[in-house]
Amino acid sequence: MQVDRDLDKVGVHCAIKDCNLLDFLPFICQGCQGQFCLEHKEEKEHKCPTPIVKIGGTTVTCDKCESILPVPVNCFEKDILSMHLRKGCPKKTTVNQHKCSFCPKMESIKIVCPNCKNNFCIKHRFERDHKCKPRVNPPLQQTISPHLQNLLSQLRNSKPVKTNS
C-alpha cells in the first residue's frame, strides 16, 4: 500500500537491529549519535560505545576542528582523539567569510562601499582608507539596445496625441 511506504519516509527506525521500531520522534544519543526508540534511548539500553561523561568526567578539544569531545570514565584522551580523527574529523567552520578587497582580512559581516561597490573590513570601510575609485557607469545610450534606441527616438519625434478629458 502506498500510504505505508510514505510513512516509512517520515520516521526513523531504532538503531537496535532486533528492535527496528519506527519512531516519529527518535531520541539521539549524545555519545554515539545513534537514533533510538523510547525503550533504547538510555546509554546502557543500547550499549553505547561512547557514553557521555556525567559527573566527574572530562572533555578534550580537537585541535583541528575545535570540537569538544567527552572522555568517558576509564578512557584516555588520546584514545578519544584518535577515534575522532579515524571517524573523520569535520573541517573547522569559519564565521568570517567576507574578504576585504584591500587587505587579506576576513570579516563576519559584509561591508560594501557605496561608491566603488567592493567589500571591505572594518579598518578599510571608509573611502579614504581604501583609496576608493568609484565605478564609472556607462552612459545610458551604451546600455540600451539599438532597437530600443530606435523606439525612443521615434517617440521623441512623434506628435503628441490629444485625449478627451
Curated annotation (Swiss-Prot):
Which UniProt keywords are given for this protein, alphabetically ordered?
Metal-binding, Repeat, Zinc, Zinc-finger
Q: Where do the annotations place Zn(2+) 3 binding? A: C100, C103, C121, H124
Q: Which Pfam families match?
A: zf-AN1
State one molecular function term (GO). Answer: zinc ion binding
Q: Which PROSITE patterns match?
A: ZF_AN1 (PS51039)
Give binding positions for Zn(2+) 4.
C113, C116, H130, C132
Q: What sections of the sequence does the record tag as coiled-coil?
A: none
Which InterPro entries does this one have? AN1-like_Znf, Znf_AN1
| GO CC term, one of those recorded | cytoplasm
Q: Where does Zn(2+) 1 bind?
A: C14, C19, C37, H40
Q: Which residues bind Zn(2+) 2?
A: C29, C32, H46, C48
- Zinc finger motifs (AN1-type), residue ranges: 8-56, 94-140
Q: Which domain of life is it from?
A: Eukaryota
Enumerate the PANTHER family for this protein: AN1-TYPE ZINC FINGER PROTEIN, ARSENITE INDUCUBLE RNA ASSOCIATED PROTEIN AIP-1-RELATED
Q: What is this protein called?
A: AN1-type zinc finger protein
This protein's species is Dictyostelium discoideum (Social amoeba)
